[in-house]
Amino acid sequence: MAIAVVLLVCVGMRRELAAALSVGDCVALASVPITWTAVRKARRFSLLLVLSILASGTAYIMSLLAESSFVVEAWARRVTTLSLLAVPCAVAVFVWGARRLGARRAALAVGFGMFLDALPLLQTSSNPWKFGIGAAVTIMVLSLVADQRRLVQIVALLVLSGVFLVSDSRSTLAFLAIILGTVIWQALASWARWHVPTPRRLAISQILVLAVVGIVAMVGVVMASESGTLGEDAQNRTIAQSSSSAGLLLSARPKLGASWALFQNRPWGYGAGVKPRFEDLWVAKQGMAALGYDPENGYVENFMFGGRIELHSGLMDMWAAASIPGGLLLLLIAGMALAAMMRDLGRLKATPWLFFAALTVVQNVFVGPWTVLPAYLPIVLGAAVLQPPLREAAQLGIDDEPSAPPRDEPTDSAVAPAQQE
């Protein structure tokens, strides 16, 4: 068990070692001989493994072919290709660790690794809670209260929401509001003894409820931001974005304009570590300008295209680095995250830490940088691999009951559910 804890904590750490490789990636890759047995028969894992290998190989080969026309950063090529290979390896670590500790404790260990990784932000960032510490603490707190009464979960979610409210973090606050609304709804449904014949129908019913809760939460956060509740900076940004002709979403994410313009200009992508040429930079700026954003402010040159192509979208970052296989991998990741939440809604007992991590993954697949994703992927994809089929959701109780100690080795019945769906 101690080995499992150490591996899981290390997987949650993204601190760079030599040659710009992260602790998490190195540990995940090195531990494959130990962890492979936990996932070798899991069907949900197979497609993830194949696409990760294909995307990594494509990124490396395209990078080599691009050397005649582009400047290629060797360190960026190495980091990108190995980070793609490390995705299924990190998932294997989580599954292997969860077989021994339970999924909740495995998520807690990864969250603790994320917390250790974010500690330097206390000295380097003006808002460390928003940019790393808050997410790690949220994973840990929600893991700790996952087997507690709903009232305890509601209090924890309210406290976390209050901290994010004063930390100028709109998206995370919206996620917590969605989870809070879901927990309250399930508490009321359980109190009213609401019964749906099958887990599939229950999941569909709760997805509809969740959609309503999500819309209300997002509208509420936008209104709070515009009113100044989230701070003056958030208020100014929201008002400016809402008044733009491109709308709130596109104004808040002008990189989407750059991504679409680059995709139209070069649909097969670039390759890992490739630095854009002047013409690529010009195309990206034109796409951002079309959304009413002024790209002549140094941000595009210094941050988006300073060392490699970074489009603030995991999907488009991996399309640029690994072409179509990279894009398909990210779409698979988003699909697995959504499927994990759907299966969890097959009962009236949502898993808060899974919802928070899955919502974060889905957001960053589409409108967040790839660099944010690796720490969350073991939690979300590992849970997706471990979950039984939706039709068996009604048989589940609370995850990791204290009276049910974790098994040292997975039984055939524990592996079978992941193979059947």
How would you label these PLM feature ranges?
Residues 19-35, 46-64, 68-95, 107-112, ...:
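Aromatic-anchored transmembrane helix interface
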Residues 198-204, 215-258, 264, 273-277, ...:
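Flexible juxtamembrane loops connecting transmembrane helices in multi-pass membrane enzymes
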